[in-house]
């Protein structure tokens, strides 16, 4: 069945001629031009056409969509796709609340007294640490961690065909793994059934964000994002600077309470600075976890490992197997630190701000029994009438 193209008839156009042998009853129309349709009620005619030119006219008034609007993962985008965050943001909001509230209370109740009594450098150091911590946190949270775009329909079909061709003639399904050699070490590449591709080395699929992330370290709900190749340096700088800020505020609050309690008891000092108790509680319970996390990631950076690799024991004997050499290590702590923290930042691969292109099929010589990728099958192939 041919496609139909609708064209508007001008009001002064004559009606189409009647087919031969067909009698049209009714009174004859008076001579003269036809009155035409009423205002607001245009007439339409249907003309057969084999081309799909009518589909372009219907999309003239439609706003072109950007790629972040149809992104298949569970991320949320802000500012027109310029910023991205994980699907859940409650824990990230709690992180912001704890940092902001503790620092604001410190600047209101402790900094004025310490600046007058000791030195003006205390509020300056606290302000520098605070702005550096917030900058690293926002960069970690709103930066693309290294998401790999999913395979298109054509790419997935070609890869499936390639996998089927490599399988044996038995009923056993073909293997979904590949092996590559990296610095003399055999590394196994696994197939991602969600993204329809073989994951590159050190890439893993995050079950929370539903994305394959390059050099996947872990998913951190405290920063509201995955930690991967493109934002790991910001994450490491964030936890390291946050440990310094927490320890600095804790030491300053203790010093403030000690100076106030010299002329009186400790309870009267607490009455003068009621926010000091809240600051001490938050800093005391935060500093141990933050310092431990900073030390653990310092070990990972020096060894050029990821949290995912360390937990799985990929290059150690944690799971009872033989310990193997880490193929990504440069055999030097300084070189590993420079490679992880100071290397060039790769560009984002998902093109969040790009426009969604319409699915067009390029003319190519194909077999008559195999439709082109992206083309609709003929009606006779799906049980319809030709």
Swiss-Prot record:
Compartment list: Golgi apparatus membrane
Task: Spell out which residues are annotated as carrying Phosphoserine.
Answer: 19
Q: One matching Pfam family, short form?
A: DHHC
Report which superkingdom the organism of origin falls in: Eukaryota
Gene Ontology molecular function: palmitoyltransferase activity; protein-cysteine S-palmitoyltransferase activity
Q: Where is the composition biased (Gly residues)?
A: 49-59
| Main subcellular location of this protein, as a coarse class | Golgi
Q: What is this protein called?
A: Palmitoyltransferase ZDHHC18
Q: Which residues lie on this side of the membrane: Lumenal?
A: 110-117, 255-275
UniProt topology in membrane: Multi-pass membrane protein
Which gene is this protein's source?
Zdhhc18
* InterPro entries in UniProt: Palmitoyltrfase_DHHC, PFA4/ZDH16/20/ERF2-like
The UniProt regions of compositional bias labelled Pro residues, in chain numbering, are 27-40
**Organism whose genome encodes this protein:** Rattus norvegicus (Rat)
- Its Enzyme Commission number(s) read 2.3.1.225
Which stretches face the Cytoplasmic side?
1-88, 139-233, 297-386
The family classification in the record reads: Belongs to the DHHC palmitoyltransferase family. ERF2/ZDHHC9 subfamily.
PANTHER family for this protein: PALMITOYLTRANSFERASE ZDHHC18 (PTHR22883:SF257), ZINC FINGER DHHC DOMAIN CONTAINING PROTEIN (PTHR22883)
| Active site as annotated | 220
Q: Which reaction does it catalyse?
A: L-cysteinyl-[protein] + hexadecanoyl-CoA = S-hexadecanoyl-L-cysteinyl-[protein] + CoA
**What PROSITE patterns would the database entry show?**
DHHC
Q: What residues does the DHHC domain cover?
A: 190-240
Which keywords does this chain's UniProt record carry? Acyltransferase, Golgi apparatus, Immunity, Innate immunity, Lipoprotein, Membrane, Palmitate, Phosphoprotein, Transferase, Transmembrane, Transmembrane helix
Free-text function comment from the UniProt entry: Palmitoyltransferase that catalyzes the addition of palmitate onto various protein substrates, such as CGAS, HRAS and LCK. Acts as a negative regulator of the cGAS-STING pathway be mediating palmitoylation and inactivation of CGAS. May also have a palmitoyltransferase activity toward the beta-2 adrenergic receptor/ADRB2 and therefore regulate G protein-coupled receptor signaling.
* One Gene Ontology term from the biological process aspect of the record: protein targeting to membrane
What does the record's free text say on domains?
The DHHC domain is required for palmitoyltransferase activity.
Region of interest: Disordered: 1-65, 362-386
């Amino acid at each position: 069945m041919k496609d139909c193209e609708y064209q508007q008839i001008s009001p002064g156009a004559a009606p189409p001629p009647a087919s031969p042998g067909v009698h049209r009853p009714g009174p004859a129309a008076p001579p003269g031009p036809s009155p035409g349709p009423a205002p607001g009620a245009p007439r339409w005619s249907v003309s057969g056409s084999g081309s799909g030119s009518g589909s372009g006219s219907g999309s003239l008034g439609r706003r072109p969509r950007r790629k972040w609007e149809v992104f298949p993962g569970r991320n949320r985008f802000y500012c027109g796709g310029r910023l991205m965050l994980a699907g859940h943001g409650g824990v990230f909001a709690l992180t912001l609340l704890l940092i902001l509230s503790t620092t604001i209370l410190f600047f209101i109740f402790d900094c004025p007294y310490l600046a007058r009594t000791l030195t003006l450098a205390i509020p300056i150091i606290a302000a520098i640490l605070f702005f550096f911590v917030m900058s690293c946190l926002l960069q970690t949270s709103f930066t693309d961690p290294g998401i790999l775009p999913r395979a298109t329909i054509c790419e997935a079909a070609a890869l499936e065909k390639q996998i089927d061709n490599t399988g044996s003639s038995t009923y056993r399904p073909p293997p979904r793994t590949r092996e590559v050699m990296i610095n003399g070490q055999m590394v196994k590449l696994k197939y991602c059934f969600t993204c329809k591709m073989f994951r590159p080395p050190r890439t893993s699929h995050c079950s929370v964000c539903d994305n394959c992330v390059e050099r996947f370290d872990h998913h951190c709900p405290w920063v509201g994002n995955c930690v991967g190749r493109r934002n790991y340096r910001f994450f490491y700088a964030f936890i390291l600077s946050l440990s310094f800020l927490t320890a600095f505020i804790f030491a300053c609050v203790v010093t403030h309470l000690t100076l106030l309690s010299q002329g009186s008891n400790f309870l009267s000092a607490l009455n003068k600075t009621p926010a000091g108790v809240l600051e001490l509680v938050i800093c005391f319970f935060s500093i141990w976890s933050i310092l431990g996390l900073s030390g653990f990631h310092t070990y990972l950076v020096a060894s050029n490992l990821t949290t995912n690799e360390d937990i799985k024991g990929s290059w150690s004997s944690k799971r009872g197997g033989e310990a193997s050499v880490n193929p990504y290590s440069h055999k030097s702590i300084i070189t590993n630190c420079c490679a992880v923290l100071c290397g060039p930042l790769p560009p984002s691969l998902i093109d969040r701000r790009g426009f969604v292109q319409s699915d067009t099929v390029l003319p190519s010589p194909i077999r008559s029994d195999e439709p082109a990728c992206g083309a609709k099958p003929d009606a006779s192939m799906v049980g319809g009438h030709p």
